[in-house]
Amino acid sequence: MTSSYHQQLQAKIDRITTQFSEFTPPTLEVFESPEQHFRMRAEFRIWHTENDMFYAMFERNDDGKQKTVVRIDEFPIADKSINDLMPLLLAELKANSLLSQRLFEVDFLATLSGEMLVTLIYHRKLNQEWEQEAKALAEKLNIKIMGRSRGQKIVIGDDFVVEEFELLNRSFKYKQIESSFTQPNAQVCKKMLQWACDAAEGSKKHLLELYCGNGNFTLPLSLKFERVLATELAKSSVYAAQWNIEQNQIDNIQVARLSAEEFTQAYQGEREFRRLQEADIDIQSYDFDTVFVDPPRAGIDDETLKLLQSFERIIYISCNPNTLYENLKTLTQTHRVTKFALFDQFPYTHHVESGVLLEKI
């Protein structure tokens, strides 16, 4: 581990340990990232000059008011497959005016399983000639390509990749849709999944999961419970979760298209939802003892926090330590922290991903 990586990680460890000390958690478990090639997605602007074009990012000056263009020829934090493809793709784009004309952004989405989706974003309408050239390029480079411009989306191959993780003595396949959220650091994601499954060990009843996304945690956690009810509001994520459940041949998960707030209303009998009836989901048939949450950066609303306090165990993955801290002020009134983890999803940034297991006092 290099000194620069170690220093930034130690700074996060010190910050989190100090911030959460009032909750007297056990010793912090630390899950490191690879130092390079850990990001499975990358987005670049395309910068055109009179006789050249290149990948670019912008660097703001100290007061944040001015931006400087930074040429990017390689991107060490991105997966090796992205770095290998970058110069090959750029050379092909430069050599083809139909593909390079008014191209302003290129996005890469890679997987550990070897798939690659490249999105080319334009400031012009894409026509049939563009589509023919894009198909030829996709075949030549063995990649999937999407073309986007205002009001247009042209898919060459698929608009998704399929990731595959080995975990709990089996493999899990995940559909990752181009425009939907996915965990960017696949190696750390695997460590998060294993930690969550360890935290769930020993359950005798059912699992409720809020904010399930594409089923990233849902699939492996289903091996630890008799039944799982997962909720998610975004239609594209629900679709991906259902595809993932089917592809992985898992038969003990139901997905409800509800927000956390809506689930609370349904669970407490305050409101009926046609979406539940149409999906043949009877919430009252579940006997939950554990709830798993991976909320957005804003954390969990007050009504949902009250709901969580009724469960024996709460497994909470957080992408924002400040909202986790605020939520724990409420949750530790009824529960104690029995596991505490830091996942270095975003090395060399201030960002921290953390996990806590809370058990009823």
Curated annotation (Swiss-Prot):
SUPFAM superfamilies listed in its UniProt record: S-adenosyl-L-methionine-dependent methyltransferases
InterPro entries per the UniProt record, alphabetical: MeTrfase_TrmA_AS, MeTrfase_TrmA_CS, SAM-dependent_MTases_sf, TrmA_MeTrfase, U5_MeTrfase_fam
Gene3D superfamilies: 2.40.50.1070, Vaccinia Virus protein VP39
UniProt-listed Pfam families: tRNA_U5-meth_tr
Presence of keyword Lipid biosynthesis: no
EC number: 2.1.1.-, 2.1.1.35
Enzyme class: transferase
Highest taxon of the lineage: Bacteria
Cellular component GO terms held in the UniProt record: cytosol
Gene Ontology terms: biological process: tRNA methylation
Amino-acid positions noted as binding S-adenosyl-L-methionine in the UniProt annotation, renumbered to this chain: 183, 211, 216, 232, 294
Residue positions of the active site: 319, 353
Catalytic activity: uridine(54) in tRNA + S-adenosyl-L-methionine = 5-methyluridine(54) in tRNA + S-adenosyl-L-homocysteine + H(+); uridine(341) in tmRNA + S-adenosyl-L-methionine = 5-methyluridine(341) in tmRNA + S-adenosyl-L-homocysteine + H(+)
PANTHER family: TRNA/TMRNA (URACIL-C(5))-METHYLTRANSFERASE, TRNA_TMRNA (URACIL-C(5))-METHYLTRANSFERASE
Protein purpose: Dual-specificity methyltransferase that catalyzes the formation of 5-methyluridine at position 54 (m5U54) in all tRNAs, and that of position 341 (m5U341) in tmRNA (transfer-mRNA).
Protein's name in the database: tRNA/tmRNA (uracil-C(5))-methyltransferase
Source organism per UniProt: Acinetobacter baumannii (strain ACICU)
